[in-house]
Design a protein with these regions (language model features):
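Surface-exposed extracytoplasmic segments
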Residues: 1-411
Length: 411
């Protein structure tokens, strides 16, 4: 698969900068004597200390390319080929996995805009949510204690793609009208990720020994997954349109999916399940358009007067950062404008924020009615909706790549 991080830096819902990650797996078959006439290949991933590449049967590498303009036809700059650390099999295979993994943080030369870093590898899952209960008809105590649920992802690992990129490499350098008789560089960017696979797969009925011999893949890269704002495809987009959303581009969101934001079903479902929490009544839901499609005025809305509403994670790159110990995990609605939906920090509780925004918290935020709505439109808008799971910003590392060491597979 081809994994891509896209940046829109002028508000037209089209990528201006893309970072592409293309992966390759290599076999290093380890064969040992076992009493027969010849050595025999072992079935395990490693034979001894897995921090020594000679003891590991497979390795994975990836190439990073920066594309300016259209993701397929734009100007391409290869940034290098790097190795990915082997997953944390267990404490017998790795005596010091944190130290081993740190050796795979790689520098990136981004030309005149500066230098960055990249790390691709296994990390502890940072997302916290009571997932099973959310999808069991929101089988929660939505007005109960914020830490009263179970984080079902607490013992899970993920493969993470982490980048540290200078702001100068991401923002548009053009001078634009910033309002109030000011001109300058628009500091707001929008970001989303995609995964693409080759359009055709031919399965080999008689694969040879080796690796990746079971199929031949070819044709154009075809997008099969997309993520901008968290939980949009999971709890906003209707079931029949989930594949369509995954294959779509942000510039087409209004044409394809506007009714899911204008007339969302989640608040109606919450009201049906919990009658004491009436759904907002302002239709179309301009407050959700502001939160999910355009950005919040004065916080993370692009300066482009012809802004194209689209699902992406928007960030004002000039917002001062807040140290972990002082962060409010409710982000903007908690008074911390450096948090979600102005970007997304690892410790931000995007589930609680999304629930509260869906139920109309922005109607009580004092923003202009044309940007959101008024308090009378959302009678339950100030209710502290929660899935009962929290995660502190101080639970993460203070240095890149910030996400914690993965859980050992042998635990």
């Amino acid at each position: 698969a081809l994994y891509e991080i896209h940046i829109d830096n002028n508000g037209d819902a089209v990528e201006d900068v893309t970072f592409q990650f293309d992966f390759k797996q290599t076999l290093n078959s380890i064969e040992i004597p076992s009493g027969g006439p010849s050595n025999v290949a072992i079935p395990l991933s490693n034979a001894g200390d897995a921090s020594n590449p000679a003891n590991v049967q497979t390795s994975e590498s990836y190439g990073v390319t920066m594309v300016k303009g259209d993701r397929r036809s734009g100007a391409r700059t290869p940034l290098g080929n790097f190795n990915k650390p082997f997953d944390y099999i267990g404490t017998k295979s790795f005596a010091d996995y944190p130290g081993y993994a740190r050796g795979f943080i790689q520098p990136l030369n981004l030309g005149t805009c500066g230098a960055g870093k990249v790390f691709v590898g296994q990390r502890a899952e940072s997302f916290a949510i009571d997932l099973g209960r959310v999808f069991d008809l929101i089988n929660l105590n939505p007005l109960g204690p914020r830490d009263g649920g179970t984080n079902v992802l607490a013992d899970k690992n993920i493969t993470s793609i982490a980048m540290e990129i200078p702001k100068a490499c991401l923002v548009n350098a053009a001078q634009v009208d910033l309002g109030n008789n000011k001109r300058g560089v628009d500091p707001v960017i929008g970001a989303w990720t995609t995964a693409s696979v080759r359009q055709a797969t031919l399965v080999n009925p008689s694969p040879a020994s080796g690796i990746s011999t079971t199929a031949k893949k070819g044709g154009a890269w075809t997008q099969v997954s997309r993520l901008g704002m968290p939980l949009v495809n999971e709890v906003v987009i209707g079931l029949k349109d989930k594949d369509k959303f995954n294959a779509s581009e942000p510039k087409d969101d209004v044409a394809n999916f506007k009714n899911y934001v204008f007339y969302p079903t989640l608040p109606a479902l919450i009201q049906k399940l919990y009658p004491s929490a009436p759904a907002p009544t302002n239709f179309p839901r301009q407050d959700l358009v502001t939160a999910f499609l355009t950005g919040v005025p004065t916080i993370n809305k692009p300066a482009n007067k012809a802004l194209v509403p689209a699902d992406m994670l928007r960030l004002n790159t000039t917002t001062p950062t807040v140290v972990a110990a002082s962060q409010n995990d409710l982000g903007v609605i908690g008074g911390d404008t450096a948090g979600f939906p102005n970007g997304r920090r690892p410790g931000d509780d995007v589930t609680d924020v999304s629930l509260r925004v869906a139920m109309g918290v922005l109607c009580h935020a004092g923003l202009p009615p044309e940007a959101t709505c008024v308090p009378a439109d959302a009678k339950a808008g100030t209710a502290p909706f929660t899935d009962g799971v929290v995660k502190s910003a101080t639970a993460f590392d203070s240095v890149f790549p910030y996400l914690k060491t993965p859980n050992a597979g042998s635990r």
